[in-house]
């Protein structure tokens, strides 16, 4: 499927997190910022989000991934990694694109924090209204 020394790069984004994913053929080892996935993301929900593109395309255990992730929190980072893995998988085989697209894994989730407006306490919270 893929030559020994070839690798595929995918950049994923979610909230303020940016993840650079380098996929190469291997046995399924995923290293995030120099640590194994189990050590970096302890909650199973985040790991499921990260591994979802591989589960959907049935490529689990066929690729090794080296991932660098910057910014954001745990949720943003796991979403960014999943987006990056999906983009890298798309480059490995064009046939996977339809599967990834139908599962919404190639679409960038553009939901970000809403900015604070002047005159309000937060994005939408107004100060208490006094009648008199």
From Swiss-Prot:
| UniProt cross-references to InterPro entries, sorted A to Z | Ribosomal_Su5_D2-typ_SF, Ribosomal_uS9, Ribosomal_uS9_bac/plastid, Ribosomal_uS9_CS, Ribsml_uS5_D2-typ_fold_subgr
The GO annotation for biological process reads:
translation
Q: Does the keyword Hydrolase apply?
A: no
A GO cellular component annotation in the UniProt record: cytosolic small ribosomal subunit
Which molecular function GO terms apply here? RNA binding; structural constituent of ribosome
Pfam families, per database record: Ribosomal_S9 (PF00380)
- List every stretch annotated Disordered: 100-132
Q: Does the keyword Cell cycle apply?
A: no
**Bilayer-crossing regions:** none
Keywords attached to this Swiss-Prot or TrEMBL record, sorted alphabetically, are: Ribonucleoprotein, Ribosomal protein
- Sequence ranges of Basic residues compositional bias: 114-132
Disulfide cysteine pairs (residue numbers) = none
Top-level taxon of origin? Bacteria
Q: What protein family does this chain belong to?
A: Belongs to the universal ribosomal protein uS9 family.
**What's the protein here called?**
Small ribosomal subunit protein uS9
**Protein source organism:** Dehalococcoides mccartyi (strain ATCC BAA-2100 / JCM 16839 / KCTC 5957 / BAV1)
